[in-house]
Regions:
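Catalytic cores of DNA base-excision repair glycosylases
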Residues: 1-180
Length: 182
């Protein structure tokens, strides 16, 4: 399929992938891209984020909303610098323990940046796999079924590529209304 040309797609840098995923929470892709580009121009490394003052970071975030995302990322960047010697942890549980890092963000960053075979399940992926599997309701049990289906696909394949492909199909083909996946 045709994948979108996204500025953070051509990197394995866990910092750039992580900040892009944080920006994309509750924010549309077309809105987030200019913020991402400005952010990377101002803060090219995780260390540059960690040492920056909160007001400078919040000023750059202005217009994206959901400021807790930004503050959590800032807090997490300081923890990574102090506790992990500036290296973003490639262990799922350790990365998940950082402020603001949920299941999806951990799955996306670890699979794309480090090749860790862990699912990255967003709303698009849930919708896609639900439709393919005939799942009608996203109960806790059904979410676990979806997670296990994806885990079973992550063998002998680049997990980052698979996760991104599933997200793209969900975002561009298996859309909520008038989907092209039936």
């Amino acid at each position: 399929g045709n994948k979108r040309e996204l500025p953070f797609r051509f990197t394995k840098d866990p910092y750039k992938i992580w900040i892009s995923e944080v920006m994309l929470q509750q924010t549309q892709m077309k809105t987030a891209i200019p913020f991402y580009n400005r952010w990377i121009d101002s803060f090219p490394t995780l260390q540059s984020v960690a040492i920056a003052k909160s007001d400078k970071i919040l000023k750059l975030w202005e217009g994206l909303g959901y400021y807790r995302r930004c503050l959590n990322f800032h807090k997490a960047s300081k923890i990574v610098m102090k506790k992990y010697d500036g290296r973003i942890p490639n262990d799922y549980e350790v990365f998940r323990s950082l402020p603001g890092v949920g299941e999806y963000t951990a799955g996306a960053v670890l699979s794309i940046a480090f090749g860790v075979p862990t699912p990255a399940i967003d709303g698009n992926v849930n919708r896609l796999i639900s439709r393919l599997s005939g799942i009608k309701n996203l109960t806790k049990r059904n979410k676990l079924i979806i997670k296990n289906k994806i885990k079973s696909l992550l063998i002998d394949i680049d997990p980052g590529d698979l996760n991104q492909a599933l997200m793209e199909i969900g975002a561009l083909v298996c859309i909520p209304k008038n989907p092209l996946c039936y």
